[in-house]
């Protein structure tokens, strides 16, 4: 399989013909931690499973093709992937970071900077090129963006920010979790590195914890591979298999997620209980604000079909309360100043019949008085 195929075909065929000896269509799960050698210097290409595993390699090769990268890397979580990227740098290096970045990313960057003299995060509105450029100093080494951002759904111009990064000799890192390569390919727009919480849309079934890095450039890929092997937070063979299996339907799922999200965003804008709806008109994620903070818990207790849970991107619809879940580690005054208010709810719109989702929301809204 080569990049001449469309993304739909690459996804549908993920893992097929990966075992020429047996012809297995489903990727085999290789649980072995060690691999025999025929003699000194006669490796099969696999030595120790932390370094390389046949099942994980299928996933890594596939995501590299999907994102048009030179190499892919699979980790035990999205946060493990970000930790590996942080290890490419050292204090007093700085990253410019989206101001409403995912709370887990904020927590890791904040802790590492304050306690381990790690990379310093500098938070700006990355939707503004002027703000990004104004924040660049002699210590700036990378720009890290989410687009759309989590949870305010702010979009960034990846191509223009990538030009700015190259102008200042900075690495451009894009978290593409929300859009996936089905809807966006940041490496094609000039980014150097793409990361994913593969737990979300790529695996897609709320049953595997996955982090992914896809990079361009031999030297950069070699550095990431060295840290991946040394740190060892690699994805297990079984989770690799689950992810390959799940991603086969990614194109179909993203279309349904997006169609449902567009309909739900329009529906929410018509409801008197809603103050605002944040939706970039692409993807399956949106956020909305209720008009009264006191309604939040009643609403979350009233939904029946939709699950109040702290994740996204699965087949089921989830609503998350950032104030006490994803962004709880950000001090309240700082969190609210960034726009992550106590009335804000994040909605991962699932694959259910959209009329059933609307009905569940409507019955929950009737409880708000």
Question: Where does each model-flagged region fall?
Answer:
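N-terminal glycine-rich, Lys/His-bearing helix-loop that initiates the first secondary-structure elements
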Residues: 1-46
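Conserved PLP-enzyme active-site core in the AAT-like
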Residues: 2, 13, 73-270, 278
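Glycine-rich phosphate/pyrophosphate-binding loop
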Residues: 29, 38-58, 65, 319-343
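Conserved N-terminal alpha-helix of the aminotransferase class I/II PLP-enzyme fold
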Residues: 34-88, 104-112
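Conserved glycine-rich beta-strand-loop-beta hairpin in the small C-terminal domain of fold type I
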Residues: 47, 261-262, 278-287
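PLP-dependent enzyme catalytic core of the Aspartate aminotransferase-like
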Residues: 111, 134, 138-141, 253, ...
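A common structural junction motif
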Residues: 231-232, 303-311, 364-369
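Conserved C-terminal alpha-helix-loop-beta "cap" of PLP-dependent enzymes
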Residues: 280-345, 349
């Amino acid at each position: 399989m080569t990049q001449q195929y469309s993304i739909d075909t690459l996804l549908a065929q993920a893992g097929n013909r990966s075992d020429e000896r047996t012809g297995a269509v489903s990727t085999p799960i290789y649980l072995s931690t060690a691999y025999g050698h025929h003699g000194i210097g006669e490796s099969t290409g696999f030595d120790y499973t932390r370094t390389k595993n046949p099942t994980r390699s299928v996933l890594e090769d596939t995501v590299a093709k999907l994102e048009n990268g030179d190499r892919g890397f699979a980790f035990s979580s999205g946060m493990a992937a970000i930790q590996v990227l942080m290890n490419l740098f050292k204090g007093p290096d700085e990253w410019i970071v989206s101001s409403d970045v995912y709370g887990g990313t904020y927590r890791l960057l904040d802790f590492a900077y304050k306690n381990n003299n790690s990379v310093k995060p500098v938070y700006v509105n990355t939707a503004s090129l002027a703000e990004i450029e104004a924040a660049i100093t002699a210590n700036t080494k990378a720009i890290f963006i989410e687009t759309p951002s989590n949870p305010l759904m702010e979009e960034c111009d990846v191509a223009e920010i990538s030009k700015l990064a190259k102008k200042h000799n900075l690495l451009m890192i894009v978290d593409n979790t929300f859009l996936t390569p089905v809807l966006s390919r940041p490496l094609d727009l000039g980014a150097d590195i793409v990361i994913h919480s593969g737990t979300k849309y790529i695996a897609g079934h709320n049953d595997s914890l996955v982090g992914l890095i896809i990079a361009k450039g031999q030297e950069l890929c070699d550095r990431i591979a060295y840290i991946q092997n040394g740190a060892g937070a690699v994805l297990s063979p079984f989770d690799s298999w689950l992810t390959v299996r799940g991603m086969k339907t990614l194109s179909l799922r993203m279309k349904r997620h997006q169609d449902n999200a567009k309909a739900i965003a329009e529906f929410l804008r018509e409801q008197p209980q809603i103050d605002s709806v944040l939706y970039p008109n692409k993807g399956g994620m949106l956020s909305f604000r209720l008009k009264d903070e006191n309604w939040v818990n009643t609403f979350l207790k009233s939904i029946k079909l939709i699950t109040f849970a702290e994740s996204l991107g699965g087949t089921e619809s989830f609503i998350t309360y950032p104030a006490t879940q994803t962004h709880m580690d950000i001090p309240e005054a700082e969190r609210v100043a960034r726009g992550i208010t106590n009335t804000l709810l994040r909605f991962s719109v699932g694959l259910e019949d959209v009329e059933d989702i609307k009905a569940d929301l409507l019955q929950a809204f009737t409880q708000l008085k």
